[in-house]
Amino acid sequence: MSNQTSSRFIFVTGGVVSSLGKGLAAASIGALLQARGFKICLRKLDPYLNIDPGTMSPIQHGEVFVTDDGAETDLDLGHYERFTGVKTTKNDNITTGKVYHNLLKKERRGDYLGQTVQIIPHVTDLINSFILHNTEGLDFVICEIGGTVGDIESQPFLESIRQIGYKLSKNNTIFVHLTLVPYIDAAMELKTKPTQHSVKELSAVGIQPDIILYRSKIPLSKEQRDKIANLCNVSPTNIIPALDVKNIYELPISYHNYNLDTQILKHFNVNSPDPNLSKWENILNISHTLTKTVTVAIIGKYIKLLDAYKSLIEALEHASIHNRVKLSIRWIDSRSLDSNGINAFDNVDSILIPGGFGDDGVKGKITAITHARLNKIPFLGICMGMQLAIVEFANNVAHLEDANSTEFNLYCKNPVIHQLPELQQNFLGGSMKLGSCPCYLDANSKIFSIYQQSVINERRRHRYTFNLQYKDLLEQHGLTFTGKANNTDDSLIEVIELNNHPWFIGVQFHPEFKSSPFHSHPLFISFIKASLSYQEAK
């Protein structure tokens, strides 16, 4: 492993339990260093054996975040992009599965020249290469290690960052460990023992944390902080609260107020001006003064785990702040919705159908689309949401018999949605149309008025598309196709709109992946504005 790098490395690990907010902590560190003028990048190392999360259930894993270059990645990369504005790539997320996939290809090629291939050094060398690659011009590289210290899957990654810490020395590496300090209601007391045990687990693999972030409802007392410092060999000034917040965009300011960025720079002996956090303060000031509320109904089948829609929720929040309104989301399980359950839409200001897979819950989504179309309620369909809007229109307006998607019925009479021919293969993983692609907009369309440009670039993740054989027929009945992948007549359809409706748009791409709190996505801004107009017109 070469130690020729001018970048400094920040490793973020987690202990006690998962879902403490390592990704948000890493993103906040990146935002704070960026606010001081440093160049940063963020990377995620996931210990699961899948090559990527593309085939994992959203109920288990949460959303799959798609990068511009078409990588299906962990949702934390979405936090990285939204907090820092730095675009992530396929080279910023690695899994155990990807490491072993590359390792075995190298072994089969004979790259190891007859060696016995082992976890150390061969697996750890590949992980080290991932961490250290493409760091030219970067002041800081922030690496989040997925999972929890003590998990068997995490051991090769922890060994790798231990090696890097040893090779590059304390002057170029820092270990930040996030733990849980639970509050026991019955005893009315914070408990530090889980943190002590977590640090002990980390020390057992040769890593001494330099900073401890503790997730808690309230800050520790000085006595409790000193106790952790003494037992964990960490300076009391480096034991920093990761307090619960109402809005995740409070985190950078909260961490700064507790000197997280100051202590990191002190560790590296780096001087810098104070961070400019005015844009974060502005977002919070706006969000704290909102009075009017719009209610968006989201109809999906993964609502048991809202992380399945993480980027979508954030994009709607960004657009709501931009429009100076509070956002209220009414989550509706598509599998429990039928034509008799339309009272679920009472007092909603708009309806949104997000992306998804499979026929489970499709009838409920169709019911929602019909309700939005007939009652002139603002409607946004994303990916499958657009496809189902076409299916609903073909059946109920164009009166095509048995119009459907071949995803749900391979032998339907009128397949208005069918599989992309070039994607018809046996493998499920990595077999979709992925990443950023251009989309050409009709100059006379609502979508053009929203974007104010004729060519846009958006990220895609789909296997099915509109069947162009039905284009003329559906246009005759009032459906317009206002965005396409290129300027040819046989181009893939990317955007649909409905005539005689105030705001009814379907998009094949995923606009939620390109929204941030400081650059709200124009499509969501327009959608929330239409929701507000609908509310005011009631």
From Swiss-Prot:
Q: Does the keyword Metal-binding apply?
A: yes
Q: Which amino acid positions bind Mg(2+), per UniProt?
A: 76, 144
- InterPro entries, alphabetically? Class_I_gatase-like, CTP_synthase, CTP_synthase_N, GATASE, GATase1_CTP_Synthase, P-loop_NTPase
Please give one Gene Ontology molecular function term for this protein: CTP synthase activity
Pathway where this protein functions? Pyrimidine metabolism; CTP biosynthesis via de novo pathway; CTP from UDP: step 2/2
Instruction: State where CTP binds.
Output: 18, 151-153, 191-196, 227
Binding residues annotated for UTP, in chain numbering: 18, 191-196, 227
List of residues binding L-glutamine? 356, 384-387, 407, 463
Top EC group: ligase
Instruction: Cite the Glutamine amidotransferase type-1 domain residue spans from the record.
Output: 295-537
Q: Give the matching PROSITE patterns.
A: GATASE_TYPE_1
Q: Which UniProt keywords apply?
A: ATP-binding, Glutamine amidotransferase, Ligase, Magnesium, Metal-binding, Nucleotide-binding, Pyrimidine biosynthesis
Q: Which GO terms describe its biological process?
A: 'de novo' CTP biosynthetic process; pyrimidine nucleobase biosynthetic process
* Region annotation (Amidoligase domain) ranges: 1-270
* Any matching Pfam family: CTP_synth_N
- Disulfide linkage: none
Summarizing activity control, the record says:
Allosterically activated by GTP, when glutamine is the substrate; GTP has no effect on the reaction when ammonia is the substrate. The allosteric effector GTP functions by stabilizing the protein conformation that binds the tetrahedral intermediate(s) formed during glutamine hydrolysis. Inhibited by the product CTP, via allosteric rather than competitive inhibition.
Q: Where is the active site?
A: 383 (nucleophile), 510, 512
- HAMAP family associated with the record: PyrG
Biological role? Catalyzes the ATP-dependent amination of UTP to CTP with either L-glutamine or ammonia as the source of nitrogen. Regulates intracellular CTP levels through interactions with the four ribonucleotide triphosphates.
Q: Which family does it belong to?
A: Belongs to the CTP synthase family.
Under the heading NCBIfam families, the entry gives: PRK05380.1, PyrG
In its UniProt entry, what is this protein called? Answer: CTP synthase
Q: Which organism is it from?
A: Ehrlichia canis (strain Jake)
Q: Which gene encodes it?
A: pyrG
